[in-house]
Amino acid sequence: MTALYYTYYPSPVGRLLILSDGESITHIDFEKEQYAPNPKWHKQDELPVFQKVRLAFERYFNGEVECFSNIPLKPEGTAFQQAIWQALREIDYGELSTYGELALRINNPKAVRAVGGAVGSNPISIIIPCHRILGKDRTLTGFGGGLEAKRFLLQLEKIPYIDKGTENTKPRFFKKYHE
């Protein structure tokens, strides 16, 4: 069994737990209130891959568009999940997609529900950008980090969305982070 290492990143959307096998990132998750690292994981803040991720997050949260392309990722999942996660990575900064559009991207237009399940099980939040997925009418849908975090990320990237019937296009939280 491969050893897993972890560190944290204090992002503006909450503390992120980052896991690595020592070479690649395997998970990035929003730390939950009752969340405790697995005792088999090793705390290691200085891994080169963790340093790359920290720098990429600093750039991302400061509004830089291309930050994550040099981060080695190794998410574990089925072939279907892997296809969806790869399709998510092809959605550029500032763009949005829907579950239906993702199903079309993988040439399986009837798999919308399965696509939703794969998006929901994304193990590498933000870098595999599941926050860029909205309902077919641009409405907010669920997000592992919570809707407030999703709003922040969408506003950071200036992605317009509809929240409770109101269109939001202004990056109001972006300014807050920089003050």
UniProtKB/Swiss-Prot annotation:
The active site is at C130. This is Methylated-DNA--protein-cysteine methyltransferase. InterPro entries: MethylDNA_cys_MeTrfase_AS, MethylDNA_cys_MeTrfase_DNA-bd, MethylDNA_cys_MeTrfase_DNAb, MethylG_MeTrfase_N, MGMT, MGMT_N_sf, WH-like_DNA-bd_sf. This enzyme catalyzes only one turnover and therefore is not strictly catalytic. According to one definition, an enzyme is a biocatalyst that acts repeatedly and over many reaction cycles. It comes from the Bacteria. The gene is ogt. Belongs to the MGMT family. It catalyses: a 6-O-methyl-2'-deoxyguanosine in DNA + L-cysteinyl-[protein] = S-methyl-L-cysteinyl-[protein] + a 2'-deoxyguanosine in DNA; a 4-O-methyl-thymidine in DNA + L-cysteinyl-[protein] = a thymidine in DNA + S-methyl-L-cysteinyl-[protein]. Pfam families: DNA_binding_1 (PF01035), Methyltransf_1N (PF02870). GO terms for molecular function: methylated-DNA-[protein]-cysteine S-methyltransferase activity. GO terms for cellular component: cytoplasm. The lineage of its organism: Bacteria, Pseudomonadati, Pseudomonadota, Gammaproteobacteria, Pasteurellales. Involved in the cellular defense against the biological effects of O6-methylguanine (O6-MeG) and O4-methylthymine (O4-MeT) in DNA. Repairs the methylated nucleobase in DNA by stoichiometrically transferring the methyl group to a cysteine residue in the enzyme. This is a suicide reaction: the enzyme is irreversibly inactivated. GO terms for biological process: DNA alkylation repair; methylation. The keyword rRNA-binding does not apply. It comes from Haemophilus influenzae (strain ATCC 51907 / DSM 11121 / KW20 / Rd). Its EC number is 2.1.1.63. Keywords: Cytoplasm, DNA damage, DNA repair, Methyltransferase, Transferase.
